Regions:
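Solvent-exposed, extracytoplasmic
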Residues: 14-24, 103-150
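Non-catalytic interaction/Regulatory regions outside core domains
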Residues: 6-12, 97-99
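Juxtamembrane extracytoplasmic/periplasmic/luminal helical "stalk" adjacent to the first N-terminal
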Residues: 1-5
Length: 179
């Protein structure tokens, strides 16, 4: 009854406060959310959603993939169609980490700031004409350290070089390739 509603509201406020505090202390996180249905989504902004965010997200490609495994963490690049479904005020992120909650119709979603990733990548100076890219294998999205790089399709993902690097036994290495 009324006590359960109060307890749920109290727990939601506690977790929203924790998310806000974490984000205030950690510039790497652009947004953190626990999505669920029945107005139970918890986000860093304290907004109560009047729709079933979890069900809506599971209806798109990203959400469907995450919903199929409670043991895996999934890494995605920025995705406009998923962002529209989530409608969580998502701005400038380049890496989304998503995980289904064990035995619950809920997911944790953390969006990592593009400026944080870009600054880390820029320290890996590839030299004149070179690129540094973060590639999310789950969806093939490429994020470049150089903001001016805009591509219609992937330059690296799916190429023979990419497959060789992904399946290689070495922990590190480099190779010059030309496009």
């Amino acid at each position: 009854g009324l006590m359960e509603v109060y307890d749920e509201s109290s727990v939601r406020k506690d977790y929203q406060s924790r998310l806000r505090n974490k984000m205030a202390l950690d510039s790497k996180i652009q947004g953190a959310y626990i999505i669920a249905d029945n107005k139970r989504t918890i986000d860093c902004q304290g907004i109560v959603r009047d729709r079933n965010v979890y069900t809506d997200y599971v209806g798109c490609g990203q959400g469907k993939l995450v919903s199929e495994s409670a043991t895996n963490w999934f890494f995605f690049g920025a995705d406009e169609s998923s962002d529209k479904v989530l409608d969580l005020g998502i701005d400038s992120y380049c890496l989304r980490i998503a995980k289904k909650m064990n035995n619950q119709p809920a997911m944790m979603i953390i969006n990592i700031s593009d400026s944080f990733i870009r600054s880390a990548m820029q320290s890996l100076d590839p030299g004149k004409g070179g690129y540094v890219a973060l590639i999310t294998d789950t969806d093939g999205k490429e994020f470049y350290s150089d903001e001016s790089v805009k591509t219609e399709k992937a330059l690296i993902y799916g190429t023979s070089f990419y497959k060789k690097a992904l399946n290689g036994k070495k922990d590190s290495g480099n190779q010059m390739i030309t496009f």
